[in-house]
Amino acid sequence: EKKSAEAATVLLEEFCSLHGYGKPDFGAYQSFFEAWITTPHAPEKSSNYRRDLDLSSGVATVRYELDGASHLREAFCSDPAGVAVVRLSADQPGQITFILDATSLHKGVEVTAADGELMLAGRVDNGKGNPPGMRFEGRIRVRAEGGTVAAAGKALTVKGANSVVLLIAGSTDHKLEHPDYQGGDPATINRATLDAAAKTSFDDLLAAHRRDHGALFTATTLRLDGVSREDLPTDRRLAEYKKGRADRGLETLVFDYGRYLLIASSRAGGLPANLQGLWNNTNSPPWMGDYHLNINLQMNYWPAGNTGLSECFEPLARWVKELAKPGAQTARVHYNAGGWVAHHVANVWGVTAPGPKRGVHMLEAESAAFICQNIWDHY
């Protein structure tokens, strides 16, 4: 009867609540913890500092020279091993000395150091008080060649090592399984993960990571003829490009970077890429770092099949399959209908109801069909 505005008002009042998206009980994609490496190196005394990220191998490196020694740091996140790996080395013996500690934005975390491991454990604020929310633990195991490793309060000290490998594991007790979403003990999971990784040398961990990452990254190659300013660092290339100077190599680099982000954010067995990706240094990210089903989540995965990253689609398909379970309840309660439904926003806890009362866009009941189009197109 051409009363869409009136209908929207009724729906907002009857269907939407004061809970959900943007509220403490909805949750957010939050920072885990930060590991800090404090060295005695004076920045003003170092030279030839360089850092880079190799998109094709997924390895980040830092190089610099200090007091006649060349220092190298290599870092990567291994999907096969389930750990982040950092190696600090130098071309002269006994050069690696640092303090390792950890901090978190979450309140009430417990940090301990013992037996060559640094551990940080806590529970998130669920917006409801007691009992608190999801449990989490981060654990770093230190393997040193030469030198000493010792606990010093809530930190580890490494002195005079030739090289050091840090194996980093992080887990929570969340499990993507409706209705309780309850997984195992994060400390137990981390110990098992680190024990398995510790049986493998750094070189073998790196080789396995390169094979795994490289198989995905090299599945598609984009080549554009024309000028390529590969002699310049990336920040300079971006600045020059904004001035209108052609750089076809930069355009292919951005294409490769987009694929790299999806490879890093969406691997089998994990959660799909959210509005924030993996990189987040706050407990209150934009849009809660959730899943917007009105187009954002769909856009994250549009390039997957087209650019040779079909393997990265699995987390989205599995998440949607689990979302359909609470979505069936929402369809019955809100619409007296079969099938399943979701609305504007969702999260990792199966939220499918409309709301809160923030506008008519919260009533987008077609969101389930929209995200299923991704699955239809993929399969």
Q: Can you say where each PLM-predicted feature lies in the sequence?
A:
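Aromatic-residue-lined binding/catalytic grooves and analogous aromatic/hydrophobic interfacial grooves
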Residues: 1-359, 366, 377-379
